[in-house]
A protein has these predicted regions:
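Non-heme Fe(II)/2-oxoglutarate
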Residues: 98, 104-184
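Feature marks short, surface-exposed loop/turn motifs that line or immediately flank catalytic pockets
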Residues: 10, 44, 59, 127-129
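Short aromatic-enriched loop/helix-cap "lid" or pocket-rim segments at secondary-structure transitions
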Residues: 14, 49-50, 62-65, 132-137
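Conserved double-stranded beta-helix
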Residues: 1-52
Protein backbone atom coordinates (compact mmCIF):
# COMPACT_ATOMS: atom_id res chain seq x y z
CA UNK A 1 0.00 0.00 0.00
CA UNK A 2 1.39 3.40 -0.96
CA UNK A 3 -1.31 5.98 -0.14
CA UNK A 4 -4.99 6.83 -0.39
CA UNK A 5 -7.02 9.98 -0.77
CA UNK A 6 -10.59 11.10 -1.24
CA UNK A 7 -10.93 13.14 -4.42
CA UNK A 8 -14.04 15.33 -4.46
CA UNK A 9 -15.03 16.87 -7.75
CA UNK A 10 -17.68 19.32 -6.60
CA UNK A 11 -20.83 19.92 -8.61
CA UNK A 12 -21.53 23.09 -10.59
CA UNK A 13 -18.02 23.48 -11.95
CA UNK A 14 -15.70 21.34 -9.85
CA UNK A 15 -12.16 21.85 -11.16
CA UNK A 16 -10.73 20.20 -14.24
CA UNK A 17 -7.93 17.72 -13.61
CA UNK A 18 -5.62 18.25 -16.56
CA UNK A 19 -4.02 15.33 -18.38
CA UNK A 20 -1.19 13.85 -16.34
CA UNK A 21 0.52 10.66 -15.22
CA UNK A 22 0.80 9.75 -11.53
CA UNK A 23 4.31 8.32 -11.29
CA UNK A 24 6.01 11.72 -11.58
CA UNK A 25 4.25 12.85 -8.38
CA UNK A 26 5.55 9.86 -6.37
CA UNK A 27 8.26 8.05 -8.37
CA UNK A 28 9.21 4.44 -7.63
CA UNK A 29 12.12 2.24 -8.68
CA UNK A 30 9.88 0.64 -11.32
CA UNK A 31 6.45 1.09 -12.83
CA UNK A 32 4.59 -1.75 -11.11
CA UNK A 33 2.38 0.78 -9.36
CA UNK A 34 -1.35 1.18 -9.88
CA UNK A 35 -4.25 3.16 -8.51
CA UNK A 36 -7.66 1.73 -7.70
CA UNK A 37 -10.54 4.18 -7.66
CA UNK A 38 -13.97 3.56 -6.16
CA UNK A 39 -16.88 5.83 -7.07
CA UNK A 40 -18.80 6.58 -3.88
CA UNK A 41 -21.83 7.90 -5.79
CA UNK A 42 -23.33 7.04 -9.16
CA UNK A 43 -21.23 8.77 -11.84
CA UNK A 44 -22.64 9.55 -15.27
CA UNK A 45 -20.98 11.34 -18.21
CA UNK A 46 -22.28 14.77 -17.07
CA UNK A 47 -20.22 14.52 -13.86
CA UNK A 48 -16.80 14.61 -15.57
CA UNK A 49 -15.73 11.03 -14.92
CA UNK A 50 -12.05 10.20 -15.13
CA UNK A 51 -10.82 9.79 -18.70
CA UNK A 52 -8.01 7.39 -19.59
CA UNK A 53 -5.95 7.31 -22.80
CA UNK A 54 -5.85 3.58 -23.68
CA UNK A 55 -2.33 2.20 -24.13
CA UNK A 56 -0.66 5.38 -22.86
CA UNK A 57 1.06 3.43 -20.08
CA UNK A 58 3.24 1.94 -22.84
CA UNK A 59 4.22 5.37 -24.17
CA UNK A 60 6.60 8.04 -22.92
CA UNK A 61 6.63 9.68 -19.52
CA UNK A 62 5.96 13.38 -19.90
CA UNK A 63 7.66 16.34 -18.24
CA UNK A 64 5.34 17.96 -15.69
CA UNK A 65 7.54 21.06 -15.36
CA UNK A 66 6.94 24.10 -17.57
CA UNK A 67 9.50 26.04 -19.62
CA UNK A 68 10.46 28.12 -16.55
CA UNK A 69 11.15 24.91 -14.58
CA UNK A 70 8.03 25.26 -12.42
CA UNK A 71 6.16 22.09 -11.46
CA UNK A 72 2.70 22.22 -13.04
CA UNK A 73 1.46 18.68 -12.42
CA UNK A 74 0.13 18.38 -15.98
CA UNK A 75 1.29 17.52 -19.48
CA UNK A 76 2.10 20.56 -21.63
CA UNK A 77 -0.13 21.57 -24.53
CA UNK A 78 2.76 20.80 -26.89
CA UNK A 79 3.19 17.27 -25.53
CA UNK A 80 -0.57 16.65 -25.65
CA UNK A 81 -0.31 16.79 -29.46
CA UNK A 82 1.64 13.50 -29.22
CA UNK A 83 -1.38 11.74 -27.68
CA UNK A 84 -4.63 10.54 -29.21
CA UNK A 85 -6.90 12.48 -26.85
CA UNK A 86 -9.94 11.58 -28.97
CA UNK A 87 -9.42 7.95 -27.94
CA UNK A 88 -10.00 8.73 -24.25
CA UNK A 89 -12.36 6.38 -22.47
CA UNK A 90 -14.40 8.04 -19.72
CA UNK A 91 -15.06 5.76 -16.77
CA UNK A 92 -18.60 6.24 -15.48
CA UNK A 93 -20.70 3.80 -13.49
CA UNK A 94 -22.86 3.24 -10.44
CA UNK A 95 -21.64 3.76 -6.88
CA UNK A 96 -19.13 1.03 -6.09
CA UNK A 97 -17.64 1.00 -9.59
CA UNK A 98 -13.90 0.30 -9.40
CA UNK A 99 -11.43 1.91 -11.80
CA UNK A 100 -7.85 0.69 -12.21
CA UNK A 101 -4.99 2.49 -13.91
CA UNK A 102 -1.25 2.04 -14.09
CA UNK A 103 0.97 4.85 -12.79
CA UNK A 104 2.16 5.65 -16.35
CA UNK A 105 -1.36 5.92 -17.80
CA UNK A 106 -2.33 9.40 -19.04
CA UNK A 107 -5.60 10.45 -17.41
CA UNK A 108 -7.62 13.50 -16.39
CA UNK A 109 -11.16 14.86 -16.18
CA UNK A 110 -13.16 17.90 -17.24
CA UNK A 111 -14.91 20.30 -14.83
CA UNK A 112 -18.01 18.78 -13.23
CA UNK A 113 -20.86 20.82 -14.67
CA UNK A 114 -23.61 18.72 -13.10
CA UNK A 115 -25.21 19.76 -9.81
CA UNK A 116 -23.95 16.57 -8.12
CA UNK A 117 -20.56 16.01 -6.50
CA UNK A 118 -18.36 13.16 -7.67
CA UNK A 119 -16.45 11.64 -4.73
CA UNK A 120 -13.76 9.17 -5.79
CA UNK A 121 -11.79 7.15 -3.23
CA UNK A 122 -8.29 6.46 -4.59
CA UNK A 123 -5.79 3.90 -3.27
CA UNK A 124 -2.33 3.45 -4.78
CA UNK A 125 -0.53 0.12 -4.51
CA UNK A 126 2.86 -1.06 -5.69
CA UNK A 127 4.64 -4.36 -6.00
CA UNK A 128 6.77 -4.96 -2.89
CA UNK A 129 9.91 -4.60 -5.04
CA UNK A 130 8.76 -1.20 -6.42
CA UNK A 131 10.20 1.11 -3.78
CA UNK A 132 9.28 4.79 -3.42
CA UNK A 133 12.11 7.14 -4.40
CA UNK A 134 10.78 10.13 -2.45
CA UNK A 135 9.45 10.20 1.09
CA UNK A 136 6.11 11.85 0.27
CA UNK A 137 4.09 9.22 2.14
CA UNK A 138 6.72 8.04 4.62
CA UNK A 139 5.41 8.06 8.16
CA UNK A 140 1.81 7.47 7.13
CA UNK A 141 0.06 4.99 9.40
CA UNK A 142 -0.37 2.41 6.62
CA UNK A 143 2.21 3.60 4.06
CA UNK A 144 4.40 0.81 2.72
CA UNK A 145 2.24 -1.84 4.41
CA UNK A 146 2.45 -5.18 2.62
CA UNK A 147 -1.13 -6.18 1.78
CA UNK A 148 -0.34 -9.50 0.16
CA UNK A 149 2.84 -11.56 0.04
CA UNK A 150 5.95 -10.51 1.92
CA UNK A 151 8.47 -7.71 1.93
CA UNK A 152 10.96 -7.79 -0.93
CA UNK A 153 14.59 -8.59 -0.24
CA UNK A 154 15.61 -7.12 -3.59
CA UNK A 155 14.39 -3.94 -5.24
CA UNK A 156 13.52 -4.09 -8.92
CA UNK A 157 14.77 -1.19 -11.04
CA UNK A 158 13.29 -0.28 -14.41
CA UNK A 159 15.85 0.83 -17.00
CA UNK A 160 13.59 3.69 -18.14
CA UNK A 161 14.03 7.04 -16.38
CA UNK A 162 11.36 8.65 -14.22
CA UNK A 163 10.91 12.38 -13.67
CA UNK A 164 11.47 13.57 -10.10
CA UNK A 165 9.01 16.02 -8.51
CA UNK A 166 10.14 19.05 -6.52
CA UNK A 167 11.66 18.29 -3.12
CA UNK A 168 8.40 18.23 -1.17
CA UNK A 169 10.36 18.59 2.11
CA UNK A 170 11.44 22.08 0.99
CA UNK A 171 8.11 23.13 -0.50
CA UNK A 172 4.61 22.63 0.75
CA UNK A 173 3.15 19.66 -1.11
CA UNK A 174 -0.07 20.85 -2.64
CA UNK A 175 -2.91 18.91 -4.19
CA UNK A 176 -2.94 18.25 -7.91
CA UNK A 177 -5.71 20.86 -8.16
CA UNK A 178 -3.49 23.54 -6.58
CA UNK A 179 -0.53 22.69 -8.80
CA UNK A 180 -2.58 22.66 -11.97
CA UNK A 181 -4.48 25.86 -11.14
CA UNK A 182 -1.25 27.67 -10.12
CA UNK A 183 -2.65 28.49 -6.69
CA UNK A 184 -0.37 29.60 -3.88
Amino acid sequence: FHHSKLNFKWGDGGEEVKWHQDIQFWPHTNFEVLTLGVYLEDVDPTMAPMGIIPGSHNGPLFDLYDESDTWTGNISENDLTLLELDSAEYLSGPAGTVTVHNCRCVHGSAPNLSSRSRPLFLCAYSAAHALPITDLTRGGKYSETIVRGKAARWAKFDSRPVLLPPDWSKTRHKSIFEHQQNEN
